[in-house]
Amino acid sequence: MSAIVDIVGREVLDSRGNPTVECDVLLESGVMGRAAVPSGASTGSREAIEMRDGDPRRYQGKGVLKAVEHVNTEISEAVLGLDASEQAFLDKTLIDLDGTENKSRLGANAMLAVSMAVARAAAEESGLPLYRYLGGMGSVQLPVPMMNVINGGAHANNSLDLQEFMIIPVGAPNFREALRWGAEVFHALKKIIHDLGMSTAVGDEGGFAPSVENHEAAIRLILQAITAAGYSAGEQIALGLDCAASEFYQDGLYVLHGEGGLKLSAPQWIDMLAAWVDKYPIISIEDGMHEGDQDGWKQLSERLRDKVQLVGDDLFVTNTRLLQQGIDQRIANSILIKINQIGTLTETFAAIEMAKRAGYTAVISHRSGETEDCTIADIAVGTNAGQIKTGSLSRSDRIAKYNQLLRIEEDLGEVAQYPGRAAFRHLR
């Protein structure tokens, strides 16, 4: 038995300088597991609740001392003595202790920090790397990275409404080469932006935030960078978009400030997305519609679900109940997985498994506020998810995940697999 003998929660800072929760879990053997939770900038209204102090005298109200106190008192008392290798039982204990549907009493950030730290301690105790502990011997697939190279929306201070413009190295032979391809395109893009006299400062997730005339201009910059780096757009490196459409949905219309204040109905906005898919090598669109625009989602899915990957983030918030509703209604064909949207590892794995059974893809994702914690890299391999979103090719909080995936690929050796285009099951 890997008994938990001590838990220590603390307030640390994330990549945006905002407080977050870190947790250490000590086992009877002396082994310790540590984890820190991420935080989002654009959040779905149905996400599990991240507990903040609300005290304007500390961190502009964003402190997490209440969540830390919950870790060090009530949660600690409930889990001390439990077997760290019984992850599902431990997570159920946390869920029952909180007693709310959205984890608002204890805070999803407090609960997730403990859930992750326990898994890390148990993996260390077993002598296994975390990905192997989580997934077993069948965990051999590295994820295709979706690299956010141009930022807009809530992640940048420019006129772009769409939140992320991503490159996806679908033609790479392995993860190491995929990472190299992405880095080379990133640097080519930086030179192009610099030569145009625009700022090469990066946003929260490490991508550039140039002030361009419209969204297609941003896409064309990326295509130019792919060519300049010596790669073929579409065949070797495809494109992905995170629209984060809930952020620019106003009074039933999609209001695009980056298109001169254009106000579009759902069908008109879908027409624009479909035109981009026909014109450019776009293979993935995330949150193409407002999270509550069910009719819009149905129309988008009917129009494009057999052509591109349609990812639900705010739509599903890593929640199996919401995902099942989407599956039943044939809305989207993919789910974004963010561990802090739901608050425990067990619930995270349940969402991934449900997606797979329904023929949906699962994309493991970071948040805009990250730490050096690399758990999502191990989850991506441990679950054979096939895809990961963890930012651009800059900022150590993003690179940490890529470097961990390099180590995992090296550890797997000849059995390591890189799915490339096959990870995107819905391409025409």
Swiss-Prot record:
Cofactor (UniProt): Mg(2+)
Compartments where located: Cytoplasm; Secreted; Cell surface
SMART domains associated with the record: Enolase_C, Enolase_N
Catalytic activity: (2R)-2-phosphoglycerate = phosphoenolpyruvate + H2O
Positions of (2R)-2-phosphoglycerate binding: Q163, K338, R367, S368, K389
Keyword entries, A-Z: Cytoplasm, Glycolysis, Lyase, Magnesium, Metal-binding, Secreted
Pfam families assigned: Enolase_C (PF00113), Enolase_N (PF03952)
UniProt binding sites for Mg(2+): D242, E286, D313
InterPro entries: Enolase, Enolase-like_C_sf, Enolase-like_N, Enolase_C, Enolase_CS, Enolase_N
Residue ranges the record marks as coiled coil: none
Domain of life of the organism encoding this protein: Bacteria
Cofactor comment: Binds a second Mg(2+) ion via substrate during catalysis.
Active site residues of this protein: E205, K338
Pathway annotation from the record: Carbohydrate degradation; glycolysis; pyruvate from D-glyceraldehyde 3-phosphate: step 4/5
GO molecular function, one term: magnesium ion binding
Gene Ontology biological-process entries: glycolytic process
EC number per UniProt: 4.2.1.11
GO cellular component terms listed in the entry, alphabetical order: cell surface; extracellular region; phosphopyruvate hydratase complex
Database matches in HAMAP family: Enolase
Family: Belongs to the enolase family.
Role of this protein: Catalyzes the reversible conversion of 2-phosphoglycerate (2-PG) into phosphoenolpyruvate (PEP). It is essential for the degradation of carbohydrates via glycolysis.
NCBIfam families: eno
Protein name: Enolase
Organism of origin: Verminephrobacter eiseniae (strain EF01-2)
This protein's encoding gene: eno
